[in-house]
Amino acid sequence: MPETNSSHAHRLFAIENAQEIYSGKLGAESLGVTTQDDYTIVFRLAAPCPDFLERLTECEFMPCNEDFFNAMGGRYGLGNKYMLCNGPFYVSAWDPKTSLTIKANKFYSGASKAKPSSVIFSFDPSAESISKKLTAGSLGAAFLSPDAPQPENTVTVSESVNSSFGFVFNCANALMSNKELRLALCSSIDRSLFGSKGSNIAPQSGLVPRSCSAGGVNYRESVGSQTPAIQYDAAAAATHWKNALSQLGEDKLTFTVLCPSWVEEQVRRQLQIWQQIMGIGLGVTVVTATADEINAAIAAGNYQVALTGIDSPYESAVDFLASFSDGGIFAFSGNEYSDIIKRLMGVDTDGELLSGCLTAENYLLGNAVCYPLYERSSRFVTSKDVDGVYMNGSESTVCFIYAKRYD
């Protein structure tokens, strides 16, 4: 429903009328889902969806007890008192701001009994704070973003190249909403300034991270040399700049670039190139900030240009690209991109899925909403005194039923 504002709603859009219901054009009774009998549910799709059976395994499709749902008076799932759990664990406490606690279910009759008596999930958006807690031993395991330092006394269980890092433009900003200005900036970025910065980072021009797949194959490897990129072209940049000034009715433009300190030197060199091409009519201020500060500014829409990571919690390239349908990190919106994603959701073959993803990626990069520079890895780490915790694929799947912590 529209009022849920769910970031995962697009996973259901393959169902007949789901997207129209979410946009408020139709009522919930129009959804293409019916029951044939007590044990059979029927889904009518708006168009063929190659990975629909896989989607049915995800939390968005989890069934619930109807009597219990109705008894909750509209608060189902909003707290531990409004949940019905029948797995190896049950939710015993939940503070949406700080943590969620689950305990072993002594009535569970499945074959696999839970080894830990309880597990606490701590909510912390700060990469620096998470690293400190792991070092101090107050966390047993965590996902570390590419910005987080490797904590002491931890073991890296797995890595995932799930982040693209580069220039991001706030398309909701009065200046950066101008496509000609964004094209002027992107077509005059000297990629050679931004060499490799360490073991956790490598040059990359595509937006979709290497962790994403499409049509059963790795998307980044499959598109290969077709990876889109805006090429350096000083003459074209100068033309775009003149067009931007004309469209904005200005003879001078000033804006601010937020960046982490480790890339400040390169950004300042890039600033010199921009000023050489665009002249004295361009004024740019470079402000350094921590990754947490930059993320907070982006979340609040309080920025113009930022160098930051664009992380994917998804294994699917389709889901990653669809997450920008409502503007996403770029605050870029338009019916044309929404239509591209809608068509992508309804393709028949794996080949069409790949080409559709490439079309969507090309559209975003061609509109200069961002300029990727690097690919980066997130890590799943555990404390050295923790065993039996591992992840499957993306950050959405972690197994801890056999977890142990040694004193």
Residues of each region from the PLM?
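Aromatic- and charge-enriched surface segment that lines or borders ligand/interaction sites
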Residues: 1-14, 175-177
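Gly/Pro-rich hinge or "lid" segments in bacterial periplasmic/extracellular proteins
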Residues: 19, 28-30, 38, 45-118, ...
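Extracytoplasmic/peripheral linker and loop segments enriched in polar/acidic and small residues
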Residues: 24-27, 228-230, 282-294, 319-385, ...
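Alpha-helical secondary-structure segments
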Residues: 38-42, 117-118, 163-214, 253-262, ...
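Ligand-site clamp/hinge motif
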Residues: 107-150
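Structural transition elements
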Residues: 199-244, 263-266
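Ligand/substrate-recognition segments at binding pockets and active sites
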Residues: 242-309
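Long beta-strand-rich cores associated with HINT superfamily self-processing modules
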Residues: 382-407
